[in-house]
Design a protein with these regions (language model features):
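Rossmann-like S-adenosyl-L-methionine
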Residues: 134-243
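Carbohydrate-binding surface patches
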Residues: 85-90
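Non-catalytic accessory regions of SAM-dependent methyltransferases
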Residues: 1-83, 137
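Conserved short hydrophobic interaction patches
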Residues: 47, 105-109, 220
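Short amphipathic alpha-helical segments
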Residues: 36-43, 94, 98-102
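Non-catalytic substrate-recognition/targeting regions of SAM-dependent transferases
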Residues: 67-80, 96-162, 170
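A short, charged
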Residues: 38-58, 111-127, 173-199, 209
Length: 243
């Protein structure tokens, strides 16, 4: 819709949803800019260009956030890349309605990619749209700073991998040469594996309460030939016993 102020002056153009708590999502303040397929292609190109040409993420990893909603100018859309798997999450009915244009733009940026799309039930209710997610895709093995990790979107553990901790994992590995490392709430073992495989730690233990996520952590350690001991335990009694 076009947006005007109380004097009738044009101020912008965007998604309107009378059923949502966020009734209006402004996408452009340029009167000449149409919100058509070319607009979505341009926005995706700009976002991908920022990651590839400015941040140069492809030199470090093939797992990174492609579209970060308002931060990249497409309100209600989050897109993540895990190797050849592109994960699309809809937070607005407007983004969902234009999903085919979005998919086409993403295919241009990532030829041959697989898609997994979803929207949380509470989002669908708030935004008044219906979308049944497909079956979870086969896991993707991604590379980050020379290490490999499994990402499993659609599983009970989000993706099983937190790409936003990339720099923190690498930073930790600078201090673990010959050290004994305890990774508390280790999830899928990212920090623990960095400490051992990249940082040269002498001994690494990872603790988590979730037995299923520890199975993923063990597979990640195997992928990197990293000897890490994973323990299924509540951290508080574990720490008391270890003291």
């Amino acid at each position: 819709v076009d947006i005007v102020d109380n004097t009738g002056h044009w101020v912008g153009r965007g998604f309107y949803n009378g059923h949502s708590r966020i009734a209006l999502r402004v996408l452009t303040e340029d009167y000449e800019e149409a919100l058509d397929e070319a607009w979505f292609v341009r926005k995706v190109r700009e976002a991908v260009g920022l990651r590839r040409d400015v941040l140069r993420l492809d030199e470090t990893t093939d797992a990174w956030r492609v579209i970060h909603s308002e931060g990249d100018g497409i309100s209600g859309l989050v897109v993540d890349r895990y190797g050849d798997l592109i994960v699309v999450e809809f937070f607005s009915a407007g983004a969902f309605r234009h999903r085919e244009w979005i998919y086409a733009a993403l295919r241009e940026a990532f030829p041959g990619c697989r898609f997994y799309s979803f929207a949380e039930e509470h989002v669908q209710k708030q935004e008044s749209f219906d979308f049944r997610s497909p079956e979870p895709p086969a896991p993707s093995v991604i590379t980050e700073n020379g290490l490999k990790f499994r990402a499993s979107p659609g599983s009970g553990h989000k993706t099983g991998f937190f790409a936003d901790q990339r720099d923190n994992r690498e930073y930790l590995s600078r201090f673990t040469q010959g050290a004994r490392v305890l990774d508390i709430c280790c999830n899928s073992g990212g920090f623990a594996i960095y400490a051992k495989a990249r940082g040269g730690a002498d001994e690494v233990i990872g603790i988590d309460l979730d037995e299923e996520i520890l199975e993923i952590a063990g597979k990640n350690a195997y992928l990197n030939n990293a000897k890490v001991k994973f323990v299924q335990s509540d951290l508080f009694p574990y720490l008391r016993d270890a003291a």
